[in-house]
Amino acid sequence: APTGAYICGREDLVELCSYVWTAPGLGAEMGSYAASYRPFFEGLFLAPHITRQAMMSAEFCAAVFKVLGFDVVPEPGHLRTDLITAITLGSEENMCSFAEAVQNWSPVDSDAVPVPGPMPGYTDPIIMAAGTFVQGSTIEMSADGPVRPPYIMYFQGGLVFEHTMLAVMGAAEKILAARGGLED
């Protein structure tokens, strides 16, 4: 475990182990986590703010794409129970444009080009965009969805609201450009 361990046995051997696991002379007096609890407490401190940033990002995404005429769930102003916004984009081209914009605006692997591909457990190709610091992170900005009618993209996360705003606007711009602009 990254935050400690249990040692049992003869008392003198347990004490010897404690010096090997921490530092000579410190032994069990050092505590269970030599690397410190700072990252743990930092996470507890930042979690409410980052969660709020992601919730604001989801709400912004829903509002932008609702104004552009796309079906979104949940709709802006409605109760949210998670960070995900489902956007019915209506075409594979729109899904790919959305994913490309999210990837382009990502802090990691922004030069990668998302393309639909097979994934175990799915019968349809999946497109994913996630230039995240932590692979598989759900609080960081990402988008994915099965490439099949009605072409729903699932957008989630965002560590920094202003950054996610740029990505959402980039996705809207890409989709609008492909269809020739904003419709009345």
Question: What are these model-derived regions, one by one?
Answer:
Residues 66-183:
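Conserved C-terminal alpha-helix-loop-beta "cap" of PLP-dependent enzymes
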Residues 1-94, 174-184:
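Active-site C-terminal subdomain of aminotransferase-like
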